[in-house]
Amino acid sequence: MASTDSVYRPTPTPDHDTTVVVVVFVSLGCVMFLAFLAFVIWFLIKKRSRKHRERSEAVRVDEHFKMKEAIVEGPNGQKSVVLSVEDDVKIEDAIKREEKDLKKDGGVGSSVVSRS
């Protein structure tokens, strides 16, 4: 009988190739996901800042003073001066925005600017 040491056995192929492929694809997938996430965050920040830029505020303040002077007699016959001051302040905030309306022209990419 022949010993088992004398039998030619082929050496097994290394399984490192599949491990490397899996590690590379998982790493690239994570990098692509992080790049996509960074792009989405950048887009949202850009959209929010553009929304703030389009809005312009106009504040109108009307202020009126009314003074009344009256001379009245006191209980002992003394004359005294009474001043009454009325301060009337009106503040109006007019916010103007550029709004895009696709319904009027019907075309894609067309915009109509309306100010209110």
UniProtKB/Swiss-Prot annotation:
It is a single-pass membrane protein. Residues 1-24 are extracellular. The chain crosses the membrane at residues 25-45. Keywords: Cell membrane, Cell wall, Cell wall biogenesis/degradation, Developmental protein, Membrane, Secreted, Transmembrane, Transmembrane helix. GO terms for cellular component: extracellular region; plant-type cell wall; plasma membrane; secondary cell wall cellulose synthase complex. Residues 46-116 are cytoplasmic. The keyword Cell membrane applies. One of its GO terms (biological process) is tracheary element differentiation. It is found in: Cell membrane; Secreted, Cell wall. Expressed preferentially in differentiating vessel elements in seedlings. Its main location: membrane. Disruption phenotype: Conditional double mutant plants lacking both TED6 and TED7 have aberrant secondary cell wall (SCW) formation of root vessel elements. The keyword Secreted applies. Involved in the secondary cell wall (SCW) formation of vessel elements (e.g. protoxylem and metaxylem), thus promoting tracheary element (TE) differentiation. Interacts with CESA7/IRX3, a subunit of the secondary cell wall (SCW)-related cellulose synthase complex. This is Protein TRACHEARY ELEMENT DIFFERENTIATION-RELATED 6. The lineage of its organism: Eukaryota, Viridiplantae, Streptophyta, Embryophyta, Tracheophyta.
